Amino acid sequence: MNAQEANFDGLVGPTHNYAGLSFGNVASLNNEKSAANPKAAAKQGLRKMKQLADLGFAQGVLPPQERPSLRLLRELGFSGKDADVIAKAAKQAPELLAAASSASAMWTANAATVSPSADTSDGRVHFTPANLCSKLHRAIEHEATRRTLSTLFADPTHFAVHEALTGTPALGDEGAANHTRFCAEYGKPGIEFFVYGRAEYRRGPEPKRFPARQTFEASRAVAHRHGLAEEATVYAQQDPDVIDAGVFHNDVISVGNRDTLFTHERAFVNKQAIYDTLTAALDARGARLNVIEVPDAAVSVNDAVTSYLFNSQLLSRADGSQVLVVPQECRENARVAAYLDQLAAGNGPIHDVLVFDLRESMKNGGGPACLRLRVVLNDAERAAVTSNVWINDTLFASLDAWIDKHYRDRLAPEDLADPALLDESRTALDELTQILRVGSLYDFQR
């Protein structure tokens, strides 16, 4: 059956800020306490969505989550009216207010892991929201993520939206940022590739400086609940040394699409065995794996982390050629820029490189790949998505005007204590649910 890969980007929320909450994420730590520009952040992401939609790629949008999370703050012991809760948290534990105010749900690569119907035992598209249990500000996302996905992908004939895995370190799950899929064509059965940082119940190498957020056990559990064939599921361990260098998710060091794996030579433990396993598995599905391995001598791990070369989108055009979507930081690094020029001029599958200004997201450690959740849909499944979430001229204009109306152009850490920010955010989100036709999605609407 004809199928297409759709990218659902997270719309940056009104509380976008730089609180330095993500240990292991170098950009997040380096930009802690800087002033952010939520309006610019939202517009940068929206412009990427629109340009890709204009090029013929299926492009959807996912709404922000409500922030600050009064639910979290009340759970942590702050009481009173909403304004009192915010004031008490700001005075007594500003780090908790920052966690409750994070707009990190914008990075929808961490929202869930998705398996298309061609791969699953029951022939439905399966979603497992990521528990993101390694970070407080992200661990509060999965319930709202499940609600959003259940709203957009509501037809049980076509879709299965699961609960997140239990939020324990043994089942640490960071979603699609540690998952990719290889196939001959999107609508045909493929190979699902899960990358983990450590295993809870068996000995193996682990990072020493920064935490490994994804466990083997979590990846395996997601594969089992999605009903994936064992012979079409491949697991790989990310090299712990690159985690210690700031590669906190695998999508910071590799990206895959169709029959192509674009990766750094230091991405994986026992890389040749992984390449061989993927090659054999994909060969059984009628395709030949094409590995584009970037040597450390050309682009170092530090170059990869600072430029986010691999936190790129690798997209297939209708003619089968592939385009790489990268942040502008890749052009500002001389070694990375030179490599990209060589790549595009070569005889490989990647013929074009598109460059986007995503500076606001990048300063928090999120490039093009972080901002999108890939969902392969056949024609019937796409028709079952009835909300107004597909980017076109009309929706782009509505969202652009909505951002202009509701977003601040400066948000410093001390501004999180402003109770007006909650009211502004709720007003904006209430209007957004009408634009996207998603009903009463938020707790404050119920």
UniProtKB/Swiss-Prot annotation:
Catalytic activity annotation: N(2)-succinyl-L-arginine + 2 H2O + 2 H(+) = N(2)-succinyl-L-ornithine + 2 NH4(+) + CO2
EC number(s) recorded for this UniProt protein: 3.5.3.23
Residues the record lists as binding substrate: 19-28, 110, 137-138, 213, 251, 364
Molecular function per GO: N-succinylarginine dihydrolase activity
Parts forming coiled coils: none
InterPro entries: AstB_sf (IPR037031), SuccinylArg_d-Hdrlase_AstB (IPR007079)
Classification via NCBIfam families: arg_catab_astB (TIGR03241), PRK13281.1 (NF009789)
Function comment: Catalyzes the hydrolysis of N(2)-succinylarginine into N(2)-succinylornithine, ammonia and CO(2).
HAMAP family for this protein: AstB
Designated name of the protein: N-succinylarginine dihydrolase
Organism: Burkholderia cenocepacia (strain HI2424)
Name of the gene this protein is made from: astB
